Amino acid sequence: NLDTLMKMFADMGNNPSFSQHMNNQLQKPIPIIKRIEITLEQVYSGCMVPIEITRNIKQSGVVREETETLYVEVAKGVDTNEIIVFREKGHIVDDSPGGDIKVFVSVLDHAHFKRSGLDLIYTKQISLKDVLCGVDFEFEHVSGKLYKINNTKGQTIIYPGYKKIVPGLGLQRQEHVGNLLIEFEITFPEKLNTNQIDT
C-alpha cells in the first residue's frame, strides 16, 4: 500500500550507500563555457551564431572527445552578459544527466550608437549656425536604412542637452520596443567675426 511504499523510499533515503549512488547518478558534469561577440546590428535583427564545442564522453572509465558545431539562436534585444544555455548538450559521464553548455553574450561597442536598455542613442554634433538657421542630416540606422532629420529654422529650438525622440526606432525585445534618442551636441565658437555676427 501507499504507506509501505513511502516507508521503503524513506529507508532508501536514509541509506548512505543508496544516497551516494543516487548523487553520483544525478550529479551533472561541469558546464562547458563559451563566449560570443555580436554587433549592435545583430542585436537589432537577431541572429544565429555558430560555435564549435568539444565535449568529453566518459563511459566505463574510458574518456573520449567529441566535437560538434552548434548554432546559438540570439534573440532580438539581447544584452551583454546574458547567458544562453544548451541543456544537457555538454560533457557526458556514464548514465548521469549530460552537462550544460553556457554561452555568454558580449555586445561590441558601436561607432555611432549607444544603447540604454532598449533605447538607441545617436549623438549629432552641430554648430551654433545650425541651431540658429536650421539643420538637416542623414544617418544610417542599425537596421541598415537611411533616415533624414530635418529641423528647419524656427521649427524646434535646439538647446544644449536637447534630445529628439523618434518612437519605435530602438531595439525590440519580445513585445517591447525602444525609441531612438538623437542627442545634439552644440559646438560654440570661441569668438564671432563681423560677418558671422551680421549673418
What are these regions (language model features)?
Residues 1-64, 71, 94:
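Post-J-domain flank of DnaJ/Hsp40 co-chaperones
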Residues 53-56, 64-199:
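Intrinsically disordered, low-complexity linker/assembly segments
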